[in-house]
Amino acid sequence: GYTFGNGDITGLRQHIGIVSSFITERLPQHMTAEKIVLTGKYKSSILYKAYGDKELQEAKDMLTSLGAGDLIGRKYRGLSQGEKQICLIARSLMEDPDIIILDEATVGLDLFAREKLLRQIDRITSLPHAPLVLYVTHPAEEITEKMDHILLLRQGKIVAQGPKNDIITPEVLADFYQNPVQIIPIDDHRFYINPLL
């Protein structure tokens, strides 16, 4: 284990993959999707190290494994927001991390791209030796079946945490939102939180 604040954070970086708009803004838009994915192998936004056909093939294979083989050869700047997010997820998986942090991963996506991305995230969590996925979001309807623990934060402080079924209750959510809410099922595993005004 690692205690936050103790030790060298450089070594810790090798165990964490991050998907964030902060990273998107720093990636070279002229590179192809597979080269963007390859930057994850080096934890860099540019390919400053020499790489060979083997490494590039790994990046292509990663895209293909996420059902995004059609992005190979396409320039990053020409991809839709959803396609860019898939590239970032593939990029975050390049070094087989222990943890993936997905920070507001669906911001800017249309309804269909959002659902496709959420399915990809569930697919990743189902893989053998899957990394722990830390999914940061505001819309509760993005919480999928595979997301089994919830941490509710308000102004940087923990309000509630625990198994999803213990946290997603009208009482806990009313305390969190400081207003009454109604939980409306979308399907067997997803829900929408409606504010009762």
Segments from the language model and where they lie:
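ABC ATPase NBD Q-loop/coupling interface
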Residues: G1-G11
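Conserved ABC ATPase "signature" region
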Residues: L38, D53-L71
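Conserved ABC ATPase signature
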Residues: K75-L79
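Catalytic Walker B motif of ABC-type/P-loop ATPase nucleotide-binding domains
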Residues: I100-E104
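H-loop/switch region of ABC-family ATPase nucleotide-binding domains
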Residues: T137-H138
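ABC ATPase nucleotide-binding domains
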Residues: F176-L197
